[in-house]
Design a protein with these regions (language model features):
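Helical lid/core segments from catalytic subdomains that handle acyl or acyl-like groups
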Residues: 128, 195-279, 286
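Long, internal scaffold/assembly segments composed of regular secondary structure
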Residues: 131-206
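Acyl/amide activation-and-transfer machinery of modular secondary-metabolite enzymes
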Residues: 2-20, 35, 119-130, 188-223, ...
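Short proline/glycine-enriched turn/loop segments at secondary-structure junctions
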Residues: 187, 262-266, 297-298
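Non-catalytic N-terminal regions of enzymes
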Residues: 1-91, 139-143, 150-173, 278-365, ...
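N-terminal amphipathic/hydrophobic targeting modules at extreme N-termini
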Residues: 369-375, 380-383
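Short amphipathic alpha-helices and their capping loops
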Residues: 1-16, 81-133, 179, 185
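A residue-level signal for beta-strand positions that form part of recognition/binding surfaces
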Residues: 37, 176, 272
Length: 388
């Protein structure tokens, strides 16, 4: 990091590849793992690519993970290695600046949203519960309602949140989804650096919806209004214009960091959870049968205790919930709703919060909760003793 801004430097070290031994989405320490802002590991026949969000977004990470998988199979099967000299050069492009236009100022407001309730998991643990379904089954249901897959799934998630976190009659706070939008779909861009925006899709506080169709109609309208090029240009303008202000550029980085932490805390409170659908993963045709599936795991945070990632491959869609909570009420209600709608779901977990669907394809992470709670109490007791 510099005095005013963070920046990336070229790293000529070799990345360290390790066997997965812990829960996913751990903090990536920039001073370890040969100082790379990403982590590559394996477990059984699964390849993991975890990345710091400042380096790339979900689509960029998917592109790299797909190519990494292809290259592994090329080496394993002794196939000719296909290389493209400029395959990942667009990582240096900043298309936020490229498509920035100075527009009239727009004021953004947010209010605290419903939070997923329940007991937290111990330190350094993350529960995974994923459901795999056939894209054809999902599309058939979407056609009945006349909506896209993302609209249908976002509405189903909101409906599940309302059913699990309210009395079904009134909402004291809005139920809100943080929905990332791939800007490459609206602007001419091939960058692998971050190029996305987020929109807030919610059901307002007050009267609860009577049925799923009511939620779907509301979600569909919001997405039609917000996910259009004109509104996304306003978002780019708002974000970039703040970076361009001379007094912001002159503020030392440690003060910027504190301000960004406060902004992140405030904005994260405005969403119940994040739902990221990055679309289909692509593997070259002669290697498709060697790859079973892809999954997208989005790290949970203190204010967004559960998140959901979706990625499709070979006619199947994987919906993966990552959770810092000890209960699975929300994903269980969500998957049950899909099955009630005529969409069979095959579930799998990493065994931390759900033993029934654990197939042994994730590392075993055993921790004694009583010992952890005792250690936490002793830690705070020692702080009190030192302060006295």
């Amino acid at each position: 990091k510099g005095f005013f801004w963070y920046y990336f430097e070229t790293n000529d070290r070799d990345p360290v590849i390790e066997k997965e031994q812990s829960a996913p989405c751990r903090f990536i320490d920039p001073h370890r793992a040969a100082r790379f802002p990403f982590r590559v590991s394996y477990f059984g026949n699964r390849i993991n690519f975890e990345v710091f969000h400042g380096l790339t977004d979900g689509l960029g990470a998917l592109r790299f993970a797909s190519r990494l998988t292809e290259h592994y199979l090329e080496l394993k099967k002794n196939l000719p290695v296909i290389t493209e000299e400029k395959e990942f050069s667009p990582l240096k492009e900043d298309d936020y600046l490229r498509y920035y236009r100075k527009l009239p100022k727009r004021h953004y407001e947010s209010e605290p949203a419903l939070q997923v309730s329940g007991e937290f998991l111990p330190f350094d643990q993350m529960g995974i519960l994923k459901g795999t379904l056939q894209v054809a089954d999902l599309k058939a249901q979407c056609r009945k309602y006349g909506v896209s897959i993302t609209k249908y799934l976002a509405a189903a998630l909101l409906w599940s949140v309302i059913r699990t976190e309210t009395d079904g009659k009134n909402l004291k706070k809005p139920a809100a989804l943080n929905l990332p939008v791939n800007l490459r779909s609206f602007f001419d861009s091939e960058t692998l650096a971050n190029f996305f925006a987020v929109v807030n899709i919610s059901w307002p506080k007050g009267r609860a919806p009577e049925n799923f169709r009511e939620v779907l109609t509301n979600v569909s309208r919001q997405m039609d209004e917000q996910i259009v090029k004109e509104r996304l240009e306003e978002t780019i303008s708002y974000n970039v214009s703040n970076e361009k202000k001379w007094y912001v550029r002159a503020i030392p980085l440690f003060i910027k960091h504190l301000a960004m932490e406060l902004i992140f805390l405030r904005t994260s409170r405005a969403h119940t959870m994040t739902f990221s659908n990055i679309g289909p993963a692509k593997i070259r045709e002669d290697l498709r049968e060697d790859v079973e599936d892809f999954e997208l795991l989005v790290g949970a945070s203190p204010k967004q205790r559960m998140k959901c990632g979706a990625v499709a491959y070979d006619g199947k869609l994987c919906l993966a919930f990552t959770s810092a909570m000890a209960e699975n009420r929300l994903p269980e209600v969500f998957f049950r709703f899909l099955e009630d709608q005529g969409i069979p779901v095959e579930q799998e977990s990493n065994g931390i919060t759900d033993r029934e669907h654990d197939k042994g394809r994730y590392p075993v992470i055993a921790q004694d909760r009583r010992k952890i709670k005792k250690a936490v109490r002793m830690f705070y007791l020692s702080l009190v003793f030192v302060s006295v």
